[in-house]
Amino acid sequence: CSDLAYSLLLSREYPGWLYEVEHGATTIWERWNGIHPDGALADPEMNSFNHYANGAILEWMYRHMAGLQPIAAAPGFQQIRYAPQPDGRLQFCKSQLLTPFGLYMSEWEITADALCFSLRIPCSCTAELVLPDAPPVIHINGAAHPYTPGMTLPSGTYRIIYAPTRCYYVRYDLETPAQVVFSNEKLLALLLQIVPQTASVPPVLSATAHESIRALLDASGISLNDAQRKELESAWAAIHQWDL
């Protein structure tokens, strides 16, 4: 669910939250495609351009991206569940939440070999830790601590670092989904430069293909020689995921 939510958040095509932003939105639309790509308006009978309702995303961003989740038994955020869900498509997240008990601050950052979290818990409050892909031992404020999901931290400021059990640092190679390659100018430019025959792939197919770029090229009858394969993977490996 988190992967799909991030896709909706970051996509500039419909259905995607940034589709509205790309078309000039400064408030939430009733329809996420209230303006068509050609500039035409959707059905005026249901086409408010200031319609903050179920299409809003900030609650999801605070609860799941930042990880600040209230607990019903402790109203007012006196106790929270800290369960952030980083995604490799974003390098970092910073958030603040002012509650009746004080200010919470949550930050995370993805590096090549670690997940790094910063959490500020206000006075008289506590947080249950539910960390993503955490190993049995994590580092809290520079010291090693055994990690158990649901362990509680009292009020204070914490820096949590660990090497996750799965990789969050995105690397591009021939197993990258074709849709990702064709939707990024840098990846596509290198592909066309090194494998010019890729230009013959039908635009509709390239834009919707969820299989790997290797599978798409094979299905299109395009074969890479060893030199092309090595040059392409070397060029893609040099691209930082957040530069795209």
Question: Which sequence ranges carry the predicted segments?
Answer:
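A short structural micro-motif
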Residues: 11-16, 197-198, 239
